[in-house]
Amino acid sequence: MSTTSVQHFAPSYPPFSSGLSSNRMAQSQTPGLDTLAEGSQYALEQLQLSREAAAGDTTATAASGPSDPMSKSKDPYDFDHHNHNHHNHHNNNHHPNSNSNNSLPGFKNPAQRDPLAEARSAIRKNSSSAPVRRRISRACDQCNQLRTRCDGQNPCAHCIEFGLTCEYARERKKRGKASKKDLAAAAAAATATPGQPNENPGKDSGTMVGGHSPPDRRQELNGRYDPAFDAARNLSGSAQPQLPHAEGPGMVGMPNTQHLPSPSQPPMGGGLEGLPMNGYNGLNDSNRPPIPVSELQSLHMLHSSNPHPRSPPSILPSQRYNGGYNENAYSLMNPQEHNPTPMNQFRLGNSTENPPNTFLGLSPPAQSPGWLPLPSPSPANFPSFSMASFSTTLRYPVLHPVLPHIASIIPQSLACDLLDVYFTSSSSSHLSPQSPYVVGYIFRKQSFLHPTKPRACSPGLLASMLWVAAQTSDAPFLTSPPSARGRVCQKLLELTVGLLRPLIHGPAPGETSPNYAANMVINGIALGGFGVSMDQLGAQSSATGAVDDVATYVHLATVISASEYKAASMRWWTAAWSLARELKLGRELPPNTSQTRQDGERENDPDADPSNRHSPSLITAMGHGPGNTVINVTEDEREERRRLWWLLYATDRHLALCYNRPLTLLDKECNGLLQPMNDDLWQASDFASASYRQAGPPLECSGHSMFGYFLPLMTILGEIIDLQQARNHPRFGLAFRGSPECDAQVLEIARQLDLYAQTLKEFETRYTSGLALGAADNDTAMEGSHLNHVSPSGRSSSTVDSRVNESIVHTKMVVAYGTHIMHVLHILLAGKWDPINLLDDNDLWISSESFIAAMGHAVGAAEAAADILEYDPDLSFMPFFFGIYLLQGSFLLLLTADKLQGDASPSVVRACETIVRAHEACVVTLNTEYQRTFRKVMRSALAQVRGRLPEDFGEQQQRRREVLALYRWTGDGSGLAL
């Protein structure tokens, strides 16, 4: 084969590797494009070597071409014959002085091949039957997200192995910037009249069916045509007869799925020429096919700079593309609005992956544009084009509001699985959240997972639920590679914060009225969307949305509280408490009217269509807003409000002990609020069976959930904290500690603790002895009829006896936890909270009667901890709450071991051993720094009790004091909040 034609076009684009091209690459300042060019040159070099291997055969065939009509290939893919005949004729006409033996750097003459080339040629001839591994043109979305190897199939082998959803939905993008000529051509194509035909379609397109260009067209290239590139283009002609743009080297054969014609988009006249790729373009622009107008569909919707909706949109921004995404180049618009509002209102900073992306997870990260050097938004941004597909594959329709935001973070199937994880119970007998970050169920599982009529939820709440579940889920998507969980959780956290609009609870973007800004200013005071002044002309936020915001704050605060950043969690807890108080969640809503609703549904029908629930603003519902105050609120919404308040009430008291702070939510704010329902009745939506309920903070143990056994303890803890704050008051504390009022409060709190202990024993008898003797058949039937949280397989495989045994074990575990916390509250009531003050013992409290009583409760708490380890070895029942009570119940044992050392009683030694075991289990389940630290301190003290005194005994005691001094419960101490 003569190389004259190849040599002639080498100055425009040398496709093969050589010393000259290598030097040019070394001097390039664009390493990303260097990689692309080198990979493309390798592919083209392999193509050239294969041609050289068959040079002898093709020369003989070409010589007989003019005389033998059968020598011409009828197959468009037989490019060896086609290109050889055509380009010899081309070179003979235009270059009479050219020598076929001349060669340029980067090209090899077939007559002067080196031994390496001949060896490669021989290898390729001998291995022609073996499959050649080729680089795939595109990886699926899952493999691209996980950065794993993909085979390009649908579904691919990796997704089949791990059970993932294999999709190719992300936008195709390429690097490089557009030339001025192409930018002008794009603008001209956008302003062309729709339906205007081309005057000369054959001339404009420059292509024929099958991807070939006519001979006269190729002769017009005048030295800028590369036959190897054309051969590679022809290889993909059957799968893609007409390429929408000129693919760069190395990009040939890639299936272009993003440029499919849309029936909803009318064709527009004019074409858009392809774009050169930063010095690596080897084709003349005139040889590139036109861009069908259906290809411009996504750009047609991105007219952010066009103030007139009816005028032709400006597709391309005025500023040049300089390697990064411009923040204002694509403010995502709703194509149905005449005055669109940008969706990217909340930029999330300091993201390590794709920092300029302001789409809140809408565009796939770390991707390049498809055919323009500008970002193309994901199809999930436009509901009219993509949301229809969600309903066909989505298991839980409740996720619809958040799907556009998580499209590039997690697949839909994983989102549904995470929702299952959120509502998963660790027990089949009684509802108990399996996730350590779900401290109590606020919402009814069936209302979220209903296949046709789910609860209407805010995107922020759904994102926070997915984030909470992703912390502990064992899905392969989150465990392989090991960094996947951290990356996904970080993106879900940023998305949740962005959707929540922290501390700003006004109307969402796009829902404001024209005079919203004026309504945010009253009497010269800018209230700025903090929920103080809703739109007085009728724009009201729904009660469900308000509750969703508070629940989202709870999710954020809970996970952060369980981490090492406990002090930072108070910002989120404070926001949740403040918003709950503002929404008056501590008060019962007025009763519903007896009239039926307009849609004909019953008032408290739990299966009613949530889309027909017209919940008003809570300010209006409480009678503080204008308009009609006769509002119908479903029982689900009422119970959600109650449970959310009581959860915040309990965590307020729990965190007051953890962080040595006063209470935020007071008892007088919720004296008239009904106590939460039994969890099993709540999940079954059996409101009739829970008709009688007490109001106000509870004091008695009533159930297996945190609202049944833990909430009464938090009510008593709140009174102990108030008493402790009064004792330590800087001015009145000294007088109060010796007053009769203080003694009366101590006696009253002790009476409440005794009442709780009595109800705890009754609770144990009712659910253990009664079930074992068969005396509580009605209770068993009632409990079993409301276990909708158990999977069908679990119900089918469980027998009645196993269910009863599991219920007994669960009850004993609840009793053990309740007993331990009750003993710790006795210690807090009688003793000191600060470990350094205990060790110093400046007031000789260790010799008082109250110390002896407190020491008895410390031993009792350790015995209860042993029972807890028996029924719950990994302490997974309530890890979020249990740590601080285990710590406070251990301080007296540490004091005894430090003072008595070898003279300690056997019960104290056993108690210390139990505390060490419990702390080790806590570290495994919910690892926190203070638990690791105190475990080391207790081990050191236990070694001293057993008589193993180290040589540096004094130094070890000093180190123990320094460690304990980090956690102070004095006047200015912050407890666990370092």
Swiss-Prot record:
UniProt cross-references to InterPro entries, sorted A to Z: Transcription_factor_dom_fun (IPR007219), XlnR/Xlr1 (IPR051439), Zn2-C6_fun-type_DNA-bd_sf (IPR036864), Zn2Cys6_DnaBD (IPR001138)
CDD domains per record: GAL4
Biased composition (Basic and acidic residues): 71-82, 214-223
GO-annotated biological processes: DNA-templated transcription; positive regulation of DNA-templated transcription; xylan catabolic process
Keywords assigned by UniProt, alphabetized: Activator, DNA-binding, Metal-binding, Nucleus, Transcription, Transcription regulation, Zinc
Main location: nucleus
GO CC aspect terms: nucleus
Protein name, UniProt field: Xylanolytic transcriptional activator xlnR
Species whose genome carries this gene: Aspergillus clavatus (strain ATCC 1007 / CBS 513.65 / DSM 816 / NCTC 3887 / NRRL 1 / QM 1276 / 107)
Gene that encodes the chain: xlnR
